[in-house]
Curated annotation (Swiss-Prot):
Residues 330-354 are annotated as: Disordered. Substrate binds at E134, K235, G236, E237, G238, F239. One of its GO terms (molecular function) is ATP binding. It comes from Arabidopsis thaliana (Mouse-ear cress). PANTHER family: 5-FORMYLTETRAHYDROFOLATE CYCLO-LIGASE-RELATED (PTHR13017), METHENYLTETRAHYDROFOLATE SYNTHASE DOMAIN-CONTAINING PROTEIN (PTHR13017:SF0). This is 5-formyltetrahydrofolate cyclo-ligase-like protein COG0212.
Amino acid sequence: MIRLSPGFAINPRFRSDSFVNSQKPPFLSVQIGSQRRNLSRIGSENGDGVAFDAVAYEADRLSLDAAAMEDMAETAKKELESDPDSDPKAWKWVIRKKMWDLMEARNYAMSPRPVHHRIPNFVGASAAARKLAELDAFRMAMVVKVNPDSPQKQIRFLTLSGEKKLLTPQPRLRTGFFSVLESDLLKPETIMEACTSVGVAKYGRAIGLDEKIKVDLIVIGSVAVNPQTGARLGKGEGFAELEYGMLRYMGAIDDSTPVVTTVHDCQLVDDIPLEKLAIHDVPVDIICTPTRVIFTNTPIPKPQGIYWDKLSPEKLRQIRILRELKNRLEKKTGRKLPTGPSEKLPPTAERKRR
C-alpha cells in the first residue's frame, strides 16, 4: 500500500539560509582520549585543559573507515566466491553488489563515491528526507534515532531543526555507544555542523547502557529494501541490527517503535527471500523515496535483543560496548553467554567444494 503524507513546516529558527556567511561559533568542549593530548588545539578546552581537535578526529575517522571498508571488500569478495548453497550470507552480497553497481552505472549515486561498501548516498536524498519529515510518526516524535550515514544527513538536520532530540550512534560503535544532541543546547549556526560526524563528537552527549530514554522513531539506511515485505539489506557490517538490539536491551524501544528507511527508487527490490533472513535482521515499517512513501505492513518479526550466538568473536573484539554488555549480563546471570561463529571464511577451494 502506498500513501503520501501531508506537508511539513520547518521551524524558521533553523532555516538553511541561517548558515550562509555565519561566523564559526566557539567549539563546545568534549572529553577526548589521552592519545590526542598532544594534538593542536582549536576552540575551548574541557575540564582537563584538553581541546577537541576536529581535524585530527576527522582524519582518524576517515582512516579507520577506509580500513573497515577494505576489510568489508575482502569479505564481500570471499562471500561472492563461496558456494551459495552452503554459505547463508552469500545471497545478500549478490544483491548488494548489483545495487552498488547499478547506482554507479546510472549515476544515481552521490558523494562519497564509489558507493560500494557504504550505505549509498543518492540523488534525491533530501527529497526523501522531506517525505519522511511529513510522516505523523516523525511529527509526533520527541526522540529520533538516525544512522550517521551521508544520505540521512538531512534527516538529522530536520530532527534538530524541528526541536527534537537526536540520537545517533558513534561511527561503527568504535569509541562508544550513542550520542544525544538537543536543539535547545545548540545555536542555529551550529545545527548543520552537528549533523556531521565531527559535529556529533563536538556537541553530542555520550550515553551509556543505563541511560533512561524512550526513542519514538528509528531511521536506518539501506542498500536494498523490499516494499512488499519491509525486508532490508544494509552494507553488511550489522551495525543497524546491533544498535537495535542494544536499544531493546535498554528498554528504549519495543515492537511498536516505527522503523523507517530512505532510499532511491532504484533501491526497491523484490528478490530478498524472507525464508533466508536471519533472526536479527531488522525490517522496516515505512520506506521514503524521493517520489513516494510506502507503508510495508511488514510481516517480519523485529529482533528482541542481541543474539549472542550469532555474534562473531571478531565483532565482539571490535566493539567495546558489546563486551561491556556481555560481561554485565554474564555477571548478572552467573552463566557464560554463547558466541557465534568466526567471520573468517575457509579458503576459496574449500568453500566451493561440494
